[in-house]
A protein has these predicted regions:
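Cysteine-nucleophile active-site neighborhood
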Residues: 1-63
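Amide-donor transfer/coupling interface in amidating biosynthetic enzymes
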Residues: 44-152
Length: 152
């Protein structure tokens, strides 16, 4: 997964997907390696860290959704992302918790990961954004295959 994401594969991850893409998950005194696509670690808690409706404003560039769009859904997570302040984010949280400090939606290359469980009917721009990102990636991959290997 990390190799494909590093090559530019578009990845949209919600909650558990965000956790999977992190470097590691910590539960009590144990740490477990994860995919390593995101330069963050996740710590699990015994109580919810975010619970309820979440609404975000897309206020920074990202691979999937136009700036100015509003996305709505819910969050329910017992985890907190460590070092989230050191990554680029695309969402200003208007309602809810997200990653904390009023932000959600980490962006690394073409990976966007957030705690937001999106309600697709309340976020109509997302489907076309996901399909558009996938089509761009396919065109780039096809062009790279036609060009052949780089000379050494």
């Amino acid at each position: 997964v990390a190799l494909a994401a590093g090559r530019g594969l578009p990845v949209w991850a919600e909650c558990g997907g965000l956790m999977f893409l992190s470097r590691s998950i910590q539960w009590k005194d144990s740490r477990y390696p994860m995919a390593g696509c995101l330069p963050v670690d996740v710590a699990l808690a015994e109580r919810p860290a975010g619970h309820g409706y979440e609404e975000v404003l897309v206020d920074r560039p990202n691979p999937f959704v136009k700036m100015g769009s509003r996305l709505r859904g819910h969050e329910f997570h017992y985890s907190q992302v460590r070092d989230a302040g050191q990554t680029e984010t695309a969402f200003e949280v208007k309602r809810g918790t997200g990653l904390g400090n009023g932000r959600d939606g980490m962006v690394i290359n073409r990976v966007l990961a957030s705690y937001l469980h999106l309600h697709s009917l309340a976020s109509p721009d997302l489907a076309s954004g996901l399909v558009g990102a996938a089509l761009r990636y396919r065109r780039e991959e096809n062009a790279a295959r036609r060009a052949g290997p780089l000379p050494e």
